[in-house]
C-alpha cells in the first residue's frame, strides 16, 4: 500500500504543470493546451521578456531609414517619437530564426511609405526566435503579450484605438499576432503570412491564429505541404476569414526543394540554408511586398480546391467580386459574412509576381488539321505574348476554351491575334482560322467578342477585330 501511494503521489507531481509570471504580461503555464498534448508533447515555458529582448522599432514617412525605439517601460518614448496619432499603424512581426531590424521587415515599411502615410513598427524578437524551434514556439506567447501591452499603452495613454492597427506576422510571427489579437478587443486586422504548422496546426484557437483574433483576418499559405515528408513549414489549416492559396499553397513557381534537406532536424534547418530550403515559406511575405504597389494584380478566386481552379471551374469572379491577396485584401472585408473561405490564384516565378487572369473561347473555321492554337491579347495598356489555348485535332466549328494568367493588365481589349501550327510538314497546306474569339477578364463581367472570316496557313498571324 505504501508503494502504491508513493507511485500515485509521484505521478500527480509529474502531472502538475509549472507556471511563470511576468509583471504586466500575466502568467504562462506549460499545461494543456500549451504542453503535454499530442501536438505539443514537451512542456516548455516561454523565456522571460528580458531574455527574449523584444524591441519595437518605429519607422515613419519622416524617418524611413532610421528607426526610433519605443519602450514598454517608458511610454514617453512614443510621444517623443515621430508616431502620428492621425495615421494607421502597421506592426510587422518576423518569424523563426529571423530579425526585425533589417531585411524584408524594413523593406516592407519602405514599400508602405510609397503608398500611404503610416506608423510602421517592426517587432524585433530575434533573440527569442533564434532558439530551438520548440522554445521559439513557446516564446510566441510572451512576444504576443508584449505587442498587446504596447497596444494597451497606445489606447490608455494616448487614446489611440486598436481599430487603427494592423498586425502583419510571418511564420511564427503570425501566431504572435494572433496571441496579441486575442488580448486586444477591437483590433482591426491581422495578416498571417504562411503561419507555421508545427506546434500550432489543429490546436485550440487560444494557441494559434484564428478569425476571432481581429475584426478581419487574412492568411496567405505558400508552404502548406505536410511537414513530414515534404518539409512544408506552413499550415494547410484555414485560420482566417479569407485564406489565400497562391499556386495551390504548397509549391511556389521558382522554388525547388533539395531532397537531402528533408533529413535535417527542424531546430537547425535554417542555419546557412534558410533562403534555399525555405523558399516556399518566404514567398508569402514577398507576395505581400509586391502587392503593396500592385492594387489589382493578385485577384483571388473562390474555389473548393486548386484542382478545380486549374480546371477552369472557378472563373470568372462571382457577383460579390474577388478579393486581392495581400495588402488590399481588407477592401473585401464586409462583403461576405463567412469565415474560412478558400481563394486561389497563380503568380509569376520570380519578382513581378502579379498576374491577371483571362478566359478565352475560340470557335475554329477552315480545314481540319492537327496542331495547336494560340492567341495574344492587345489592349489600350499593352499586349500579352502568345498563349497556347488548345492542342489536338482542329476541326471547323469546334470551340475550345482556356484560362491563362497574363503578366500585365492589357486594359480595354481592342483586338486579338490568332496563330496555329503543328511543326509537321503538311503538303496540302491547310488553312485554319477563328470565326469568333470571346475574351473575359476574370474580375469583370464584360465579355469581348472578336470575329474574322479569314483563314491562314500555319505560323501566320490572323488579326480578329471587335464584332
Swiss-Prot record:
Pancreas. Coiled coil: none annotated. One of its GO terms (molecular function) is lipoprotein lipase activity. The keyword Calcium applies. GO terms for biological process: cholesterol homeostasis; fatty acid biosynthetic process; high-density lipoprotein particle remodeling; triglyceride catabolic process. Residues 356-467 form the PLAT domain. It is found in: Secreted. It comes from the Eukaryota. Residues 1-17 form the signal peptide. Its main location: secreted. Ca(2+) binds at residues 205, 208, 210, 213. GO terms for cellular component: extracellular region. The active site is at residues 171, 194, 281. May function as inhibitor of dietary triglyceride digestion. Lacks detectable lipase activity towards triglycerides, diglycerides, phosphatidylcholine, galactolipids or cholesterol esters (in vitro). PANTHER family: INACTIVE PANCREATIC LIPASE-RELATED PROTEIN 1, LIPASE. This is Inactive pancreatic lipase-related protein 1. It comes from Homo sapiens (Human). The gene is PNLIPRP1.
Amino acid at each position: 500500500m505504501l508503494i502504491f501511494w508513493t507511485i500515485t503521489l509521484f505521478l500527480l507531481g509529474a502531472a502538475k504543470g509549472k507556471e511563470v509570471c511576468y509583471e504586466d504580461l500575466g502568467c504562462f503555464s506549460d499545461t494543456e493546451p500549451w504542453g503535454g498534448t499530442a501536438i505539443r508533447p514537451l512542456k516548455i515555458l516561454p523565456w522571460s521578456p528580458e531574455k527574449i529582448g523584444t524591441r519595437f522599432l518605429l519607422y515613419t514617412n519622416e524617418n524611413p531609414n532610421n528607426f526610433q525605439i519605443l519602450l514598454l517601460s517608458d511610454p514617453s518614448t512614443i510621444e517623443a517619437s515621430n508616431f502620428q496619432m492621425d495615421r494607421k499603424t502597421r506592426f510587422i512581426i518576423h518569424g523563426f530564426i529571423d530579425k526585425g531590424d533589417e531585411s524584408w521587415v524594413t523593406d516592407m515599411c519602405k514599400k508602405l511609405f510609397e503608398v500611404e502615410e503610416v506608423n510602421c513598427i517592426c517587432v524585433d524578437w530575434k533573440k527569442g526566435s533564434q532558439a530551438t524551434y520548440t522554445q521559439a514556439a513557446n516564446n510566441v506567447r510572451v512576444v504576443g503579450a508584449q505587442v498587446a501591452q504596447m497596444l494597451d499603452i497606445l489606447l490608455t495613454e494616448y487614446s489611440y484605438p486598436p481599430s487603427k492597427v494592423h498586425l502583419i506576422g510571418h511564420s511564427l510571427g503570425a501566431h504572435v499576432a494572433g496571441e496579441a489579437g486575442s488580448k486586444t478587443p477591437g483590433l482591426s486586422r491581422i495578416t498571417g503570412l504562411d503561419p507555421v504548422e508545427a506546434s500550432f496546426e489543429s490546436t485550440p484557437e487560444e494557441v494559434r491564429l484564428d478569425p476571432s483574433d481581429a475584426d478581419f483576418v487574412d492568411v496567405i499559405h505558400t508552404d502548406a505541404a505536410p511537414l513530414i515528408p515534404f518539409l512544408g513549414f506552413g499550415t494547410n489549416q484555414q485560420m482566417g476569414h479569407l485564406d489565400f492559396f497562391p499556386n495551390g499553397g504548397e509549391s511556389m513557381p521558382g522554388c525547388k526543394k533539395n531532397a537531402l534537406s528533408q533529413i535535417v532536424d527542424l531546430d537547425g534547418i535554417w542555419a546557412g540554408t534558410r533562403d534555399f530550403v525555405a523558399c516556399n515559406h518566404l514567398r508569402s511575405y514577398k507576395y505581400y511586398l509586391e502587392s503593396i504597389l500592385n492594387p489589382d494584380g493578385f485577384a483571388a478566386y473562390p474555389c473548393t480546391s486548386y484542382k478545380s481552379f486549374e480546371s477552369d471551374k472557378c472563373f470568372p469572379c462571382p457577383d460579390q467580386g474577388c478579393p486581392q491577396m495581400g495588402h488590399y485584401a481588407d477592401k473585401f472585408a464586409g462583403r461576405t459574412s463567412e469565415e474560412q473561405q478558400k481563394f486561389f490564384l497563380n503568380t509569376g516565378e520570380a519578382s513581378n509576381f502579379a498576374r491577371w487572369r483571362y478566359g478565352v473561347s475560340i470557335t475554329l473555321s477552315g480545314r481540319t488539321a492537327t496542331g495547336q492554337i494560340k492567341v495574344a491579347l492587345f489592349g489600350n495598356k499593352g499586349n500579352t505574348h502568345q498563349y497556347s489555348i488548345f492542342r489536338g485535332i482542329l476541326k471547323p466549328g469546334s470551340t475550345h476554351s482556356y484560362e491563362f494568367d497574363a503578366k500585365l493588365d492589357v486594359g480595354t481589349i481592342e483586338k486579338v491575334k490568332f496563330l496555329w501550327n503543328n511543326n509537321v510538314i503538311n503538303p496540302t497546306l491547310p488553312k485554319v482560322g477563328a470565326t469568333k474569339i470571346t475574351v473575359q477578364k476574370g474580375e469583370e463581367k464584360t465579355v469581348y467578342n472578336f470575329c474574322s472570316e479569314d483563314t491562314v496557313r500555319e505560323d501566320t498571324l490572323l488579326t480578329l477585330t471587335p464584332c
